[in-house]
Design a protein with these regions (language model features):
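The feature marks the mature, well-folded catalytic cores of soluble enzymes
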Residues: 1-239
């Protein structure tokens, strides 16, 4: 009997044996496993100041620059500080009046993104400035859609991504973020929705972590209405 015939014979024998083979039952019930997963994530405070503090802590771990500001004037001033520090020469922004106003004091070239904007032009700017749909305190993530980010490319192609958020957009966790999407867009959801958790990270086979290989190397989140409510000195800065 050839090796092939031997293998086929063993398969036929196994099939003739029939009968369902049950895997041993796990001692952990599904609800126990869910509880175990939840223990991995930090507990989210119920109050706004506690959630800002948690977002700041997660940002520090993720190497996100988090800048809480008292109002739009302070946010505009922070943008100028970041621009001067990073030596921005140009920025790209969506067609958004609030973002236009915040950037009005910057003495840099401004590219307002439209459907006709070339991707190569976005790759050349110093920073891409977008809004967002939500900030997630528990994970330090930013929720974006094509609508809030001015399309798909503005949050991906520039080397530095800057997110402008308001205090009303800070939510506790991922389920709350999905509720935001449901209430804001259902049933006509945007074609692009994403969670951004820190700058772009790529790990190779040798476990070498590289920032910015497949997306922005730097991520800055400016929270308007969040000053004085985060941990420490009120900011989480990663230069």
């Amino acid at each position: 009997m050839s090796a092939r015939d031997s293998i086929l014979a063993r398969i036929r024998e196994a099939l003739r044996a029939g009968g369902a083979r049950h895997l041993p039952e796990s001692e952990d019930q599904p609800s126990d496993r869910v509880t175990g997963v939840r223990r991995v994530l930090p507990k989210v405070p119920n109050d706004f100041s506690g959630q800002v503090a948690l977002f700041a802590e997660r940002s520090e771990v993720l190497k996100t620059e988090f800048l809480p500001c008292s109002d739009e004037s302070a946010a505009s001033a922070q943008l100028k500080i970041v621009s001067d520090r990073e030596k921005w020469e140009s920025v790209a922004l969506p067609a958004d009046d609030r973002i236009r106003t915040l950037l009005s004091t910057l003495a840099v070239a401004k590219l307002e993104v439209s459907r006709s904007t070339a991707k190569t032009d976005l790759e050349k700017v110093s920073a891409g400035i977008t809004g967002c749909d939500a900030l997630i305190a528990q994970t330090g993530s930013v929720l974006l859609t094509a609508q809030s980010a001015g399309g798909r490319a503005l949050s991906v192609l520039p080397v530095h991504h800057v997110v402008i958020a308001t205090s009303a957009q800070l939510v506790a966790d991922l389920p709350a973020a999905f509720e935001v999407l449901e209430h804001k867009y259902a049933p006509n959801f945007p074609s692009f929705m994403t969670f951004i958790t820190g700058p772009s990270r790529t790990g190779d086979i040798e476990r070498v972590l590289v920032l910015g290989a497949h997306g922005p190397r730097k991520l800055t989140v400016i929270l308007i209405g969040g000053e004085g409510t985060s941990a420490g000195d009120g900011t989480s800065k990663v230069m």
